[in-house]
Amino acid sequence: MAGLLALLGPAGRVGARVRPRATWLLGATAPCAPPPLALALLPPRLDARLLRTARGDCRGHQDPSQATGTTGSSVSCTEEKKQSKSQQLKKIFQEYGTVGVSLHIGISLISLGIFYMVVSSGVDMPAILLKLGFKESLVQSKMAAGTSTFVVAYAIHKLFAPVRISITLVSVPLIVRYFRKVGFFKPPAAKP
């Protein structure tokens, strides 16, 4: 019910426009720093990140007229969120092309083969997955009673997708850099 109410919004209809009260929280259309009145209303123990953001722009750079002796680490606004794994994978595929795609497919096939071999050998995979920290509801939904060995292996293979994607994201640039250094690949073309 709460999900339906969130979809409908406060006006009770889908797509109702709501004017936000704190436009400075949106980031893209408003400055990153909250207005001075909002800073005065915050509790006395202010977060250092909030103070750095209020003193400078949203990337941690300060106005030279307001510079202090301390240097803060780079702070980003909420508008600059980290990309998801799938977005990072698409970027790798666009940048490295067939090398990225073929390496990811190779890693996926090896992973599926290993999980098929483990499941067909009779290892109790649900117990291992629970020890690794997967939720019991997730494990039970992926492993219904009476499913074939391949289906169970494929379900476990899908559970480990973030690991495979991370391996691809780390290894593709390293492999391409090595092959370019050896001379197997041409250096990248200069962008106009």
UniProtKB/Swiss-Prot annotation:
Cellular component terms per the entry's GO annotation: membrane; mitochondrial outer membrane; mitochondrion
Biased composition range(s): Polar residues: 63-77
Annotated membrane topology: Multi-pass membrane protein
Regulation: induction: Up-regulated by the erythroid transcription factor GATA1.
GO biological process: cellular response to estradiol stimulus; erythrocyte maturation; inflammatory response; positive regulation of erythrocyte differentiation; reactive oxygen species metabolic process; skin development; spleen development
Region: Disordered, residue numbers: 57-80
Domain of life: Eukaryota
Record-annotated membrane-spanning stretches: 99-119, 150-170
Tissue: Expressed in late erythroblast differentiation stages. Underexpressed in ovarian cancer epithelia cells compared with normal human ovarian surface epithelia.
Keywords attached to this entry: Differentiation, Erythrocyte maturation, Membrane, Mitochondrion, Mitochondrion outer membrane, Transit peptide, Transmembrane, Transmembrane helix, Tumor suppressor
Role this protein plays: Plays a role in erythroid differentiation. Involved in cell proliferation and tumor cell growth suppression. Involved in the metabolic reprogramming of cancer cells in a PDK4-dependent manner.
Name recorded for this polypeptide: Protein FAM210B, mitochondrial
Gene that this sequence comes from: FAM210B
